[in-house]
From Swiss-Prot:
Chain segments annotated as transmembrane: 68-88, 152-172, 229-249
Annotated keywords: Cell membrane, Membrane, Signal, Transmembrane, Transmembrane helix
Protein name: UPF0749 protein Rv1825
UniProt record similarity statement: Belongs to the UPF0749 family.
Residue segments, region Disordered: 1-30
Signal peptide: 1-28
UniProt membrane topology term: Multi-pass membrane protein
InterPro entries: DUF881 (IPR010273)
Main location: membrane
């Protein structure tokens, strides 16, 4: 007789299945207990394909590009700002006397007075030397001429004698009035820098010879130059190379522009002959003595 075996196989299969489920549950329980989450061993795993460029990636890349261009723009603005500040500082360098402290101005004035004292002492020394040469009957004509030329040059420089020669005649009208002391100082300094050898400032009634220690104070419409009060219009005579002196007045941002900025008007005329007749009186010096 044959026996029917399917029932035990089914039982065995059911038992195996039950065992596998028990192991899986135990493994999952153990994974949860250990803090790991894993798929069952018989669970199919999905394949990870290549990453695609998303809209977020494009936005991030666009943001980086904008950041680079923004940084370059900021750097360009900084460079332009530095250049502008440098230019402004160079343009305003002529106005340093306006912002100088009174103590600094006193030191500057004292140094100019010492310079004038030295020049006056040298003039006196040369005059004494010339007198000694003439008194001794020295026939060295070259030495006499050299001493006389040096004495004449220094005498003109300190304003002890008059002078004549080519130069410029400057007229400053100030209807405002607006020409302040620093504007007049700028005109004097520009002429000196251009090689003016003798300068004289006039108004309708007074004349002042500009020296190495000349100072200007006051208010627009009433300028005090070396203790003399002058009123507009002002006339300035300067001896030197006429084209050079005229060009110095017309430098952009220079003396003529400074007069225009405050409402004044400057006219510069070149001349073959300019006569500077005002003199400066030598000052008695208490401390400075000529060096032998």
């Amino acid at each position: 007789m044959s026996e029917n075996r399917p029932e035990p196989v089914a039982a065995e299969t059911s038992a195996a299945t039950t065992a596998r489920h028990s192991q899986a549950d135990a493994g999952a329980h153990d994974a949860v207990r250990r803090g790991r989450h894993e798929l069952p061993a018989d669970h199919p795993r999905s394949k990870v394909g290549p990453l695609r460029r998303t809209r977020l990636t494009e936005i991030l890349r666009g943001g980086r590009s904008r950041l680079v261009f923004g940084t370059l723009a900021i750097l360009l603005c900084l460079v332009l700002g530095v250049a502008i500040v440098t230019q402004v500082r160079q343009t305003d360098s002529g106005d340093s006397l306006e912002t100088a402290r009174p103590a600094d101005l006193l030191v500057l004035l004292d140094s100019l007075r010492q310079r004038e004292a030295t020049l006056n002492a040298e003039v006196i020394d040369l005059q004494n030397t010339l007198n000694a040469l003439q008194a001794s009957g020295n026939t060295d004509q070259a030495a006499l001429e050299s001493a006389q030329a040096r004495l004449a040059a220094l005498s003109i420089l300190v304003g002890a004698v008059g002078a004549t020669g080519p130069g410029v005649m400057i007229t400053i009208d100030d209807p405002g009035p607006g020409v302040a002391p620093e504007v007049m100082i700028d005109v004097i300094n520009e002429l000196r820098a251009a090689g003016a050898e003798a300068i004289q400032i006039n108004d309708a009634h007074r004349s002042v010879r500009v020296g190495v220690d000349t100072w200007v104070v006051g208010v627009p419409g009433s300028l005090t130059v070396d203790t003399k009060v002058l009123s507009p219009p002002y006339s300035i005579l300067a001896i030197g190379d006429p084209p050079t002196l005229a060009a110095a007045m017309n430098i952009p941002g220079g003396a003529q522009d400074g007069v225009k900025r405050v409402g004044g008007r400057m006219v510069v005329q070149q001349a073959d002959r300019v006569d500077v007749t005002a003199l400066r009186q030598p000052k008695q010096h208490q401390y400075a003595q000529p060096v032998k």
